[in-house]
Regions:
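Iron-sulfur-associated redox domains of electron-transfer enzymes in respiratory
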Residues: 1-140
Length: 143
């Protein structure tokens, strides 16, 4: 007998890990948020490589969060490519500038705080995308 994970509140967070300073900042912020239990982490490169287990996990999550370092938005674009519309947070929108955000613990704390504010709804432009298929398992609500 299979067990459905519908409506279990599964949140998965993905990050940019680009070569730019803001990519490193996004990656480290996501690692910190994961440690704090904000969401489970997963691999955006596996999404880009179309690895089925990773794709199904992203599609089945109740909330998918994309943290990008710069306006290119690779994390968000990779998720959209597989049909997932994530809660998208771009560090550029939080005031971090590419080429001017060399990693430091204080910048990390600011990035983590900004991401938490957006996720909690403190920023008006936040559009939280919750899976509306009726479930979090990707079955379409038929279980």
């Amino acid at each position: 007998m299979s067990s459905c994970a519908c409506n279990t509140g599964i949140k998965i967070i993905y990050s940019c890990s680009g070569a730019a300073d803001v990519g490193e900042l996004a990656d480290r912020a996501v690692r910190q948020l994961r440690k704090e239990g904000i969401a489970q982490g997963s691999c955006i490169a596996a999404i880009g490589a179309d690895l089925s287990g990773y794709v199904q996990s992203a599609k089945g999550a109740d909330m998918t969060i994309a943290i990008d370092g710069c306006p290119v938005g690779c994390t968000k674009l990779n998720l959209e490519k597989i049909g997932v519309t994530p809660v998208a947070i771009n560090l550029a929108d939080l005031g971090f500038k590419k080429g001017e955000s060399a990693f430091s613990e204080s910048l990390l704390a600011s990035a983590v705080d900004g991401i938490k504010r957006v996720l909690s709804g403190d920023k008006a432009e936040t559009a939280v995308n919750v899976n509306t298929s009726g479930s979090g398992c990707g079955c379409g609500g038929n279980c």
